[in-house]
Regions:
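Transmembrane beta-barrel domains of outer membrane proteins
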Residues: 50-52, 93-95, 127-131, 138, ...
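Short glycine/proline- and aromatic-enriched beta-strand/turn motifs that initiate or cap beta-hairpins
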Residues: 19-61, 151-155, 159-161
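Residues that define the transmembrane beta-barrel architecture of outer-membrane proteins
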Residues: 22-24, 41-45, 84-88, 120-124, ...
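Cleavable N-terminal export/targeting peptides
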Residues: 1-23
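Mid-chain, well-packed structural core segment of small domains
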Residues: 97-118
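Transmembrane beta-strands of outer-membrane beta-barrel pores
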Residues: 30-36, 65-71, 108-114, 132-134, ...
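Repeated loop/turn-to-beta-strand initiation elements of outer-membrane beta-barrel proteins
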Residues: 23-24, 57-61, 101-104, 132-139
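Helix-adjacent hinge/juxtasegments
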Residues: 67-104
Length: 162
C-alpha cells in the first residue's frame, strides 16, 4: 500500500511540473544593452506572450509574440531626441524541461521594426530559467540582427503561466 501511495505521489508531482511548462505564458523582462547598442542605449524592456504545447516528454514548442524596446541615451546624440528602437518579435519558441523545475530553450523568428526607418531583422533569444509552478524566473539574451548592425541585451525576466 505504501508503495502504491508513493508511486501515485511521484506521478502527480511529475504531471504538475510538466503542466507548469505548457499552456499560455505571459512574461516581462528588462535588460542591459550589449554590443552595438551598449554605448547608445540605457536599458531594454520587453513583454511576450507564448502558447506552449507538449510534443514529447519534457519538450515544449509553440508560437510567441512580443514587444521589445531599447531606450536610447539622448546624451550620446548631442542632446537631440532620438526615437527608441521598438520591435514586435514573432517567433517559434522551444523549451526543454530539466529535473527540479529548471529549463532551457530558445525563441527564433523575425522582429518587425515599429519605427520609421526600422526594417526589423532576424530575432533570437536563448534562455534558461527555473519554474516555481505557475511563476518562472528567466535569464536570457535578446538578439536582433538588422542590416548594418545588431541590437542585443542580457535580460532578467519573470513569466506567469495562465
Amino acid at each position: 500500500m505504501k508503495r502504491l501511495v508513493l508511486i501515485v505521489c511521484f506521478m502527480l508531482m511529475g504531471a504538475t511540473v510538466m503542466q507548469a511548462q505548457s499552456g499560455l505564458r505571459v512574461g516581462a523582462n528588462i535588460g542591459l544593452p550589449v554590443g552595438d547598442m551598449e554605448e547608445v542605449s540605457n536599458f531594454q524592456a520587453g513583454v511576450d506572450l507564448a502558447y506552449m504545447l507538449s510534443v514529447a516528454d519534457m519538450l515544449y514548442v509553440g508560437p510567441m509574440v512580443g514587444y521589445t524596446r531599447f531606450f536610447m541615451d539622448e546624451d550620446n546624440f548631442g542632446g537631440f531626441e532620438v526615437d527608441d528602437p521598438a520591435f514586435l518579435p514573432i517567433a517559434a519558441s522551444g523549451r526543454v524541461a530539466l529535473a527540479e523545475g529548471f529549463f532551457f530553450g530558445t525563441d527564433l523568428g523575425y522582429a518587425v521594426g515599429l519605427n520609421d526607418g526600422n526594417d526589423g531583422g532576424f530575432y533570437y533569444r536563448p534562455q534558461a530559467g527555473y519554474n516555481f509552478g505557475k511563476i518562472g524566473l528567466i535569464a536570457s539574451y535578446t538578439g536582433i540582427s538588422v542590416d548594418g548592425g545588431s541590437f542585443g541585451s542580457i535580460n532578467l525576466g519573470i513569466e506567469f503561466g495562465l
